[in-house]
Design a protein with these regions (language model features):
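Short glycine-centered segments of the SAM/dcSAM-binding site in methyltransferase folds
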Residues: 67-69, 95
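Acidic carboxylate diad motif detector
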Residues: 72-73
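C-terminal hydrophobic helical "lid"/dimerization subdomain
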Residues: 8, 57-61, 104-156
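Adenosine-nucleotide cofactor-binding segment
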Residues: 1-58
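Helix-to-beta-strand junctions that scaffold the AdoMet/dcAdoMet cofactor pocket
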Residues: 63-65
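C-terminal substrate-binding/catalytic core of Rossmann-like NAD(P)-dependent dehydrogenases/reductases
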Residues: 32, 36, 40, 78-127, ...
Length: 156
C-alpha cells in the first residue's frame, strides 16, 4: 500500500496502520509517475478518500492497465467536476467506482474480521469527543487537521 499526503504527520500515521511506502505530495513534481515507479507500473487499485479534484486525477493517473479507482471522498462545490483523464481511462481500460461506504449485507464479514483481529478500527481513531463538541468539529472539517477519525463517544 502506498499512502500519499501533504502532511508528514499523516504519512507517519499511515505507516503505523499498514502503508508500505509513502509519498509526500508537496515534494513530488509528478505523483502519478512516482506511484508507477514505486509499484512497478502503476497501482492495481487507487482510493481518493479526500474528495479533491487534484487527488482524484492523480489517483486515476497512477493506475496500471485494468486498474480500478474508488472515489470515496465527496467532491462538492468547486471540486465537483474534476478533470478525469478519460484518454487514460479508455486506453488502459480502467474502472472507476463511486462509493458511499460498505453495503450493510457485508457488515457481518467485516465484524468477523474485527473479532479475529484482522481489522483493528481502533487504530484509526484519532480523537474522541462529546456530542456537544460536534458542531465545532464539523465546521473545521475542511481544514483537514489531525490524524485519524473523530468519534463521538460521550452523549451526556
Amino acid at each position: 500500500m502506498i499512502a500519499i499526503d501533504i502532511a508528514a504527520e499523516k504519512l507517519d500515521f499511515a505507516r503505523t496502520v499498514g502503508a508500505h511506502r509513502t509519498i509526500h505530495g508537496d515534494r513530488e513534481n509528478d505523483i502519478a509517475e512516482r506511484v508507477r515507479e514505486i509499484s512497478g507500473g502503476g497501482a492495481h487499485v487507487s482510493v481518493d478518500a479526500l474528495g479533491n479534484s487534484v487527488t482524484c486525477r492523480n489517483s486515476i493517473s497512477g493506475l496500471r492497465k485494468h486498474g480500478k479507482h474508488i472515489q470515496v471522498g465527496l467532491l462538492s462545490g468547486a471540486e465537483s467536476m474534476p478533470a478525469i483523464p478519460m484518454d487514460s481511462v479508455i486506453s488502459n481500460e480502467l474502472e472507476i467506482l463511486g462509493s458511499h461506504g460498505m453495503q450493510a449485507h457485508r457488515y457481518p464479514a467485516m465484524l468477523d474480521m474485527i473479532l479475529a483481529r484482522k481489522l483493528q478500527p481502533a487504530k484509526l481513531v484519532g480523537k474522541t469527543i462529546h456530542l456537544d463538541e460536534l458542531p465545532t468539529h464539523l465546521a473545521k472539517m475542511d481544514g483537514f487537521n489531525g490524524t485519524g477519525v473523530t468519534v463521538v463517544d460521550r452523549f451526556r
